[in-house]
Swiss-Prot record:
Region (25 X 2 AA repeats of G-[YCGS]): 3-76
Induction per the UniProt record: Expression in skin and hair follicle is regulated by HOXC13 and by GATA3.
Name of the molecule in the record: Keratin-associated protein 6-5
Subunit structure of this chain's protein: Interacts with hair keratins.
UniProt cross-references to InterPro entries, sorted A to Z: KAP6
Domain of life: Eukaryota
GO cellular component: intermediate filament
Family statement: Belongs to the KRTAP type 6 family.
BP GO terms, sorted: keratinization
Function of the molecule: In the hair cortex, hair keratin intermediate filaments are embedded in an interfilamentous matrix, consisting of hair keratin-associated proteins (KRTAP), which are essential for the formation of a rigid and resistant hair shaft through their extensive disulfide bond cross-linking with abundant cysteine residues of hair keratins. The matrix proteins include the high-sulfur and high-glycine-tyrosine keratins.
Expression tissues: Strong expression in narrowly defined pattern restricted to the lower and middle cortical regions of the hair shaft in both developing and cycling hair. During hair follicle regression (catagen), expression levels decrease until expression is no longer detectable in follicles at resting stage (telogen).
Species in which this protein is naturally found: Mus musculus (Mouse)
Length: 78
């Protein structure tokens, strides 16, 4: 599950911040593999490359157990 509704609720999904949408999702504006903000392999706030990863924290909070919860945008680790 990737949390389709996560786009509007901080991206509560697995792996990233939902699937598609304005701010979150694979290849979306704020999330996805190799996107710019928030999540993905080389995201601004999270992902495998920049500032986040497995069990890490970040400003935007995405990825596996990263930032704030398991693949969510706002919530748990903070």
């Amino acid at each position: 599950m990737c949390g389709y509704y996560g786009n509007y609720y901080g991206g509560r999904g697995y792996g990233c911040c939902g699937c598609g949408g304005l701010g979150y999702g694979y290849g979306g504006l704020g999330c996805g593999y190799g996107s710019y903000y928030g999540c993905g392999y080389r995201g601004l706030g999270c992902g495998y490359g920049y500032g986040c990863g497995y069990g890490s924290r970040s400003l935007y909070g995405c990825g596996y157990g990263c930032g704030s919860g398991y693949g969510s945008g706002f919530g748990y680790y903070y």
